[in-house]
């Protein structure tokens, strides 16, 4: 008996051990990412030819303790290598495992290489050459917990490479993963009709057809690791190949199972047909170009097994949630009596199906950990009602009905109001229903969802499910393209700057506000370039600016400065510490045709600039951050702690008869009115003038003050 190790992805071990037992192996022992077994040479060949789950078969030559570099060298040197491969063959070493004296795998590989070369020389043979990329003979070594296993790659190139695939789609599924899905779903045992509505390059269906027709998975392969192994018995191997060809011929004539595959991409369907033809099963599979939501269930019952698109693969998350929600409808309405198995790396997408899983398994797709869920559709169901059209007093569906109804109500009211107001961007929803803790802003025909951090006592699974329901409900509630929904996470942080960059991608739009135009960037930063809650404050700045010199401190993208300039200001000075936002402010001025020397842009620390400037102004707008500890600031800034000192400096810049509009977003802000009045200021809260209709549900979003000279 010979010893072997069948390597496979983690999670395959149990199914692989059953397959090996069925093929006739003995002394089967599961390990991490594989299974040890014993078999005579003929059976070792047979397993290599017929295993659908293994990644590779390793012929084990030596296994024993290894506690030092010397022990590793001696273990490799003790093998009679000239009986394994010719010195005219090239070789390579794949070393796996770390720990103890093995600090990196290259060290282990070099030790074994030295031992092999020395053994050949000591036995009076010239040394074989190392070929790292495409060696004739690949030695495989595993080091784990003080034990070394040395063997050679009996099967050669990875066994999932069956030999029938011409090229792959954008997100190919490995053949042994497809086989594992067929085994673990129960289809291999059931042997019934099979449908894959996201067939891609056809892997699941081709693997299934090969199973049903008794076609060996290795029958189309041209290379094996034992080709350059000196004890290789070509006669036995050829007999096994002939037997496999005969079984395939008989199996194809007896197969009565029907296979159905479809994909929306005609290029992929053509590729699937070529792959199926190469595998010899094209005549068994009915391939069609079709949207998965339009697929008709074949008569009777069967299995639907698929790997639909998910987050890492081909799609925007919001549109994918919509797809999965509609798939759930499709399955319930049209696939009564069917068994369904779905592979996905995103459990939130699976939850959007709104189906209860009979079984949930983990299954890796390459390095990506996935869920493999099995469902049974027990009876035909009518299609669910669109959540946006459900009345709260009616039947409550499994989707967020109150949220959908609130969104629809808000949209109807605010869309009409926005058109009258002369704006095209507004806040649609702001945690109106506490369970759905998001803010939703509409920018033209795009929507930005900001997810607030949930309280720690709420389970993460609950918050994820609620967010999923929000993303599913929103497109139909307001008639927006799911691809136009952008999701961000906003935490109420302390000790960090609010202007952190989020992503490299940009999505720029031009929005209009009371005749002013502003550039938006919906993706790159947490904020978009325009604080919608300050809309009326900016309008007020514009109304007060005619014939006056204006200064905008902590200007962000200069939107208040634009309103001041359009309002007739004699000069506008825009100050911000960020070069990015100063440049953005200049773009906003250019958008509005405002090009003049009377518009000044200053990149500076506002707190320091106020102390050193000699300029004086008639109107100053100051909207500092709640907190900042930017690298460009020597000290941190806290608006509650520092507003008195800051406003004292601002007041010194004010001309007689001038006004300061001071605003901030600290929810529990307390103005030091008495102290300011003692310094000769008149202070008036003007929140009621600056809170727009779309923020009436959140009256503490900001607080605004008008400051003038007393008397």
From Swiss-Prot:
EC numbers: 2.1.1.173, 2.1.1.264
InterPro entries to which the protein is assigned, alphabetical: 23SrRNA_methyltr_KL, RlmKL-like_Mtase, RlmKL-like_Mtase_CS, RlmL_1st, SAM-dep_methyl-trfase, SAM-dependent_MTases_sf, THUMP_dom
Domain THUMP: 43-154
Main location: cytoplasm
Signal peptide: none
PROSITE patterns: THUMP, UPF0020
Subcellular location: Cytoplasm
Enzyme class: transferase
Protein name: Ribosomal RNA large subunit methyltransferase K/L
Species annotation: Shewanella halifaxensis (strain HAW-EB4)
Lineage: Bacteria, Pseudomonadati, Pseudomonadota, Gammaproteobacteria, Alteromonadales
């Amino acid at each position: 008996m010979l010893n072997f190790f069948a390597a496979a992805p983690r999670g395959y071990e149990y199914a692989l051990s059953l397959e090996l037992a069925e093929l006739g192996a003995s002394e089967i022992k599961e390990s991490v990412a594989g299974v040890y077994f014993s078999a005579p040479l003929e059976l070792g060949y047979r397993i290599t030819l017929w295993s659908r789950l293994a990644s590779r078969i390793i012929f084990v030559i030596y296994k024993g303790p290894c506690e030092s570099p010397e022990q590793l060298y001696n273990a490799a040197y003790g093998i009679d290598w000239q009986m394994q491969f010719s010195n005219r063959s090239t070789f390579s070493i794949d070393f796996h495992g770390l720990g103890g004296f093995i600090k990196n795998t290259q060290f282990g590989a070099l030790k074994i290489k030295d031992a092999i070369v020395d053994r050949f020389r000591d036995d009076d043979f010239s040394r074989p050459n190392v070929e790292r990329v495409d060696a004739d003979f690949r030695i495989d070594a595993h080091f784990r917990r003080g034990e070394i296993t040395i063997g050679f790659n009996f099967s050669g190139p990875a066994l999932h490479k069956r030999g029938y695939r011409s090229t792959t789609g954008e997100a190919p599924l490995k053949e042994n993963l497809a086989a594992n899905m067929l085994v673990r779903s129960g289809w291999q045992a059931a042997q019934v009709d099979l449908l894959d509505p996201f067939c891609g390059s056809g892997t699941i269906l081709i693997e299934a057809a090969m199973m049903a027709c008794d076609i060996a998975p290795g029958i189309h392969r041209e290379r094996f690791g034992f080709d350059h192994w000196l004890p290789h018995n070509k006669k036995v191997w050829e007999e096994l190949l002939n037997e496999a060809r005969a079984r395939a011929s008989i199996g194809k004539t007896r197969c009565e199972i029907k296979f159905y595959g479809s994909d929306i991409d005609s290029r992929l369907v053509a590729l699937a047909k070529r792959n199926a033809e190469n595998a010899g099963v094209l005549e068994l599979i009915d391939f069609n170009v079709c949207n998965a939501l339009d697929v008709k269930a074949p008569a009777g019952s069967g299995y639907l097994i698929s790997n639909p698109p998910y987050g890492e693969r081909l799609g925007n998350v919001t549109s994918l949630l919509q797809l999965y929600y509609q798939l759930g409808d499709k399955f319930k309405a049209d696939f009564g009596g069917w068994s369904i198995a779905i592979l996905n790396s995103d459990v939130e997408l699976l939850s959007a199906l709104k189906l209860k899983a009979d079984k949930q398994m983990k299954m890796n797709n390459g390095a990506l950990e996935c869920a493999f869920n099995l469902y049974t559709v027990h009876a035909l169901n009518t299609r669910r009602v669109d959540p946006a059209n459900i009345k709260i007093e009616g039947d409550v569906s499994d989707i967020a009905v109150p949220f959908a109804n609130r969104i629809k109500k808000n949209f109807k009211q605010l869309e009409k109001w926005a058109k009258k107001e002369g704006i095209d961007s507004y806040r649609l929803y702001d945690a109106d229903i506490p369970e759905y803790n998001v803010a939703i802003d509409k920018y033209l025909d795009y929507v930005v969802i900001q997810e607030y951090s949930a309280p720690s006592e709420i389970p993460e699974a609950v918050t994820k499910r609620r967010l999923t329901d929000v993303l599913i409900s929103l497109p139909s509630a307001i008639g927006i393209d799911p691809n136009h929904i952008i999701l961000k996470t906003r935490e109420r942080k302390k000790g960090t700057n609010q202007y952190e960059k989020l992503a490299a991608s940009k999505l720029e739009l031009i929005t209009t506000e009371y005749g002013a135009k502003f550039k938006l960037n919906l993706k790159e930063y947490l904020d978009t370039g325009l604080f919608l809650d300050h809309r009326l404050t900016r309008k007020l700045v514009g109304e007060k600016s005619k014939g006056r010199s204006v200064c905008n401190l902590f200007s962000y993208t200069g939107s208040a400065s634009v309103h001041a300039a359009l309002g007739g200001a004699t000069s506008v000075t825009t100050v911000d510490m960020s070069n990015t936002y100063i440049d953005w402010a200049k773009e906003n001025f250019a958008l509005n045709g405002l090009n003049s020397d009377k518009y000044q842009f200053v990149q500076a620390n506002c707190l320091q600039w106020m102390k050193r400037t000699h300029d004086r102004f008639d109107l100053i707008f100051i909207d500092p951050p709640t907190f900042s500890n930017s690298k460009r600031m020597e000290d941190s800034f806290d608006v509650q702690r520092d507003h008195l000192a800051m406003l004292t400096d601002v007041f010194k810049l004010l001309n007689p008869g001038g006004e300061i509009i001071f605003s901030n977003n600290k929810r529990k802000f307390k103005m030091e009115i008495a102290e300011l009045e003692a310094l000769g200021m008149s202070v008036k809260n003007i929140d009621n003038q600056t809170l727009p209709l779309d923020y009436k549900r959140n009256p503490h979003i900001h607080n605004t003050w008008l400051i003038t000279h007393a008397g």
